């Protein structure tokens, strides 16, 4: 499986094999596309109980959905995790998959933009949920609209499609 470079990404977008909505050409880099942070977040409630890690445990039962007004920020305290979501909806056609990765400029501040599960399978058509955690020593102000992460595209041997639980997640269903 090979990683798509800028020209291959642009060609796949032009041919409809990759769809990014909204699409901002300036966010296409040499081997990835930057994705920006939406203004909707899920903040974990402070609980003093054990959370069972099971297939049917739903993060929505443990979080409150908030909207950050334009020009404002969400504050992520050291050791805290909040859920964010990309503004862009990403669709991958057959034969493509990819990886959601953080950006080193923010990692150096202690911000991890996804805890686990960076792989995105072929056929996804969704906004990407970000498990954002502050591993640094100080609170972090994070602003909606910032290019928070990047998506690296790969060619896939085969034409399989991902049809799992989060295949078509949006800001509304998040």
Map each language-model feature to its residues.
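DUTPase catalytic domain/fold
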Residues: 1-174
